[in-house]
Amino acid sequence: MTDTHGTFIPTADLVDIIGDDVRSCDTQFRNLGGRTDFHGTITTVKCFQDNALLKSILGEDNPGGVLVIDGDASLHTALVGDIIAGLGRDHGWSGVVVNGAIRDSAVIGEMEFGCKALGTNPRKSSKTGAGERDVVVSFGGVDFTPGHYLYADSDGIVVTENPVKAPASN
């Protein structure tokens, strides 16, 4: 897969390239989007059981970007559904990582959009706009810093300060 951010490098290969200093997320997310492999520049939002702020962010054009959503690991309400995921896809986002729940998983699973989340819950979240944007969020032993780079695939998530160039093949 290639996009405006260059060639995707599988996370296992990134670990081999980077070595012991790798920033690999320990949290075991479920792949719920139609794209398992996705990557891009990180934008963050911290919100608890409220998705109005993240919806407005995904409504902004961000070709190849990845929104990291820290919902404090709550599975009580869904932060992303098919409408919000479709909004992100339509504005060029590569995908989302949700430290929380989503809903409409069957529809999201058919979208050309990356989505990793802890699980699902059909319950809607509130819509007050509470939350913080572009702050460092931390989970799974990794700090997700706005402007840094995220690679996600079926093996997990790796975060780097900048995109990694694939080594030349022999």
UniProtKB/Swiss-Prot annotation:
- Enzyme class at the top of the EC tree: lyase
How and how many cofactors are bound, per the record note?
Divalent metal cation.
State which Enzyme Commission number(s) the record gives: 4.1.3.17, 4.1.1.112
Going by the UniProt record, its keywords in alphabetical order are:
Lyase, Metal-binding
Q: Which reaction equation describes what this protein catalyses?
A: 4-hydroxy-4-methyl-2-oxoglutarate = 2 pyruvate; oxaloacetate + H(+) = pyruvate + CO2
Write down the required cofactor(s): a divalent metal cation
Annotated Gene Ontology MF terms? 4-hydroxy-4-methyl-2-oxoglutarate aldolase activity; metal ion binding; oxaloacetate decarboxylase activity; ribonuclease inhibitor activity
Sorted alphabetically, the Gene Ontology BP terms of this entry are: regulation of RNA metabolic process
Binding residues for substrate = 81-84, 103
- The domain of life is Bacteria
Report the InterPro entries cross-referenced here. Answer: RraA, RraA/RraA-like, RraA/RraA-like_sf
Q: Which residues bind a divalent metal cation?
A: 104
Subunit annotation: Homotrimer.
Function field: Catalyzes the aldol cleavage of 4-hydroxy-4-methyl-2-oxoglutarate (HMG) into 2 molecules of pyruvate. Also contains a secondary oxaloacetate (OAA) decarboxylase activity due to the common pyruvate enolate transition state formed following C-C bond cleavage in the retro-aldol and decarboxylation reactions.
Instruction: Report the sequence similarity comment from the record.
Output: Belongs to the class II aldolase/RraA-like family.
Q: What is this protein called?
A: Putative 4-hydroxy-4-methyl-2-oxoglutarate aldolase
